[in-house]
Curated annotation (Swiss-Prot):
Pfam families: Thymidylate_kin. The gene is tmk. This is Thymidylate kinase. The keyword Nucleotide-binding applies. GO terms for cellular component: cytosol. ATP binds at residues 10-17. It comes from Yersinia pseudotuberculosis serotype O:3 (strain YPIII). Keywords: ATP-binding, Kinase, Nucleotide biosynthesis, Nucleotide-binding, Transferase.
Length: 212
């Protein structure tokens, strides 16, 4: 079948790394071995520099919400145009750790940036480019943040309030409910059950794709 762009989304501590491993295992079982991995923000030299600024800040300067979202879209368009689109064009599959849905949820939901502005930014920067499938790993923010804290020091965004992540989750769920290409996975389950749910959702989706 033709190359596809699959994205894994979720709050901090949702288990995106484990989900990626599961996705790769399912794809390889289907004979799909040419896989490119991406992360957002990041994935190109410029985008990685922006990632550091977004996550850590610089010299204590306050990063405004609109500056943050513009930096995210600058990093995203670099990744899409320089990595993702070329990979898809040469027949590779792309598995991404976050994409535009993160901005719609974190900046649109968590930060409260106007949803029309967020949609306009997406459409202006990305045009009609969208993932073929998004796996959204859903879990209560308190659970995810506890997992993130257990990993070590939190970055600038991970230090946001629980209310911020509650708003972010609510926007994720709202967007997932209105888009058939987004599959919601209960990430509060034990890891084995989460992997099984991902495998089932991905396998079912693959059976509905047109062969080459």
């Amino acid at each position: 079948m033709n190359s596809k762009f699959i994205v894994i989304e979720g709050l901090e501590g949702a288990g995106k790394t484990t989900a990626r491993d599961t996705v790769v295992a399912v794809l390889r079982a289907q004979g799909i071995n040419d896989i490119v991995f991406t992360r957002e923000p990041g994935g190109t030299p410029l985008a990685e520099k922006l990632r550091d600024l977004i996550k850590q800040g610089i010299d204590g300067e306050v990063l405004t919400d609109k500056a943050e979202v513009l930096m995210l879209y600058a990093a995203r368009v670099q990744l899409v145009e320089n990595v993702i689109k070329p990979a898809l064009a040469r027949g590779s599959w792309v598995v991404g750790d976050r994409h535009d849905l993160s901005s719609q949820a974190y900046q649109g939901g968590g930060r409260g940036i106007d949803s029309q502005l967020m949609a306009s930014l997406r459409d202006t920067v990305l045009g009609e480019f969208r993932p073929d499938l998004t796996l959204y790993l859903d879990l209560p923010p308190a659970v995810g943040l506890a997992r993130a804290r257990a990993r070590g020091e939190l970055d600038r965004i991970e230090q946001e309030s629980l209310a911020f992540f509650e708003r972010t989750r609510a926007r994720y769920l709202e967007l997932a409910a209105s888009d058939a290409s987004i599959k919601t996975i209960d990430a509060s389950q034990p890891i084995e059950q989460v992997s099984a749910s991902i495998s089932q959702a991905l396998a079912q989706w693959l059976t509905n794709q047109e062969p080459v």
